Amino acid sequence: AMYQENAPELIYYMALYRIFSEFLDDVSEDVLPNEGLGFRDSLIWNKLYDFQKDAALAIINKLETYNGCILADSVGLGKTFTALAVIKYYESRNKDVLVLCPKKLRDNWITYNSNVVNNPIAGDRLQYDVLYHTDLSRTRGTSETGLPLDRLNWGAYGLVVIDESHNFRNGGDSASEDRM
């Protein structure tokens, strides 16, 4: 028979495959998150909603493919926790991580990599460094987070997370641009 009855769900899946098959061909094992690292067993991963988990995996894929990604969700959707899951993944791969944030957000980021009672993910033992946006324009001294700016090995970071990155949309001095 030339006609065969198919469930609507099958037609839907076939349409999705036809639309996204080229994308699926581009996805290789090299850019998919390594499940053997156990990052899905982390405290931060298990605090995420499904949409945040999807975002974290997509970010990792984009970072591995393009060496960069922008997470631009609306206010209140948990960008910080999504970023923390990505940080956990890279730290699981023994990559050093730098978080650049405005001074007003210091306490948020310091809490999540510290062994303090109000850190809900202290068991994940995150070890990222924190610098302020304004530290990029300095070449001497010590950051308020204790890092020596004149001896900092900027090239050692396997991941740089920039919180409130829209603050960089206007030109700055050349010293900070060289580090970026």
Give the location of each predicted region.
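ATP-dependent helicase/translocase motor core
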Residues: 1-74, 81-93, 155, 159, ...
